[in-house]
Amino acid sequence: MKSLRVVVRRHGGPEVLEIVEDDAPHPASGELRVQIIAAGVSFAELLMREGIHPEKTTLPFTPGWDIVGIVDEAGEGASHAMLGKLVAALPIHGGYAQFICLPEDELTSVPTGVDPIEAVSLVLNYVTAYQMMHRLGHASPGQRVLIHGGRWCRHGSAATWPPGRFRDVWDCLSFRSSDRI
């Protein structure tokens, strides 16, 4: 079976994105293959494509930090229970493709009824918000939290985390958008 993916062979603007056809990958031992339904598009991918992201990438590479798709093949030793399940992952590379093979422990089940496009919008955004809160902000239970622009990024904000996690969660927004509250 053939599959398509995007490849970056040299750094630059969008003109360096090349669509190539290859044989579809098959999962190695302990891996699952995901037929990708949705892939996120982020500023980090733009920086990688241009060669200026702090995490250097070896050329050629397939961009795509975050994906959602259906598990359609299991490698030796991987759980067949995941076959047919909707999953999300943060592979950093390889998401701009029809298929990706990843270690089973890098996949997270997407709850039944959640739209794949909505789900993929949460993967990188949520991880980024979580890291900002905990790695940089050292947020801990009982603290007050201010989220700049949080009203419009609810899915990745502390406001969606378990009730009672923070003492108060405050959103800050501009006067221009205050009529939308």
Regions found by a protein language model. Name each.
Residues 1-4:
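Extreme N-terminal starter segment of soluble prokaryotic enzymes
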Residues 16, 81, 100-102, 179-181:
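Short loop/helix-cap segments at secondary-structure boundaries that form the rim of catalytic
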Residues 18, 30, 65, 104, ...:
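Exposed loop/turn and edge beta-strand positions of beta-sandwich/beta-sheet ligand-binding modules
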Residues 19-24, 68-70, 99-101, 107:
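Conserved hydrophobic/aromatic beta-strand scaffold that supports enzyme active sites
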Residues 23-41, 52-94:
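Glycine-rich beta-strand-centered segment in the early N-terminal region that forms part
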Residues 44-50:
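Cytochrome P450 core scaffold surrounding the K-helix E-X-X-R motif
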Residues 47, 58, 86-150:
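NAD(P)H dinucleotide-binding glycine-rich loop of Rossmann-like/cofactor-binding domains
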Residues 82, 122, 126-181:
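Mid-domain Rossmann-like dinucleotide-binding core that forms the NAD(H)/NADP(H) cofactor-binding site
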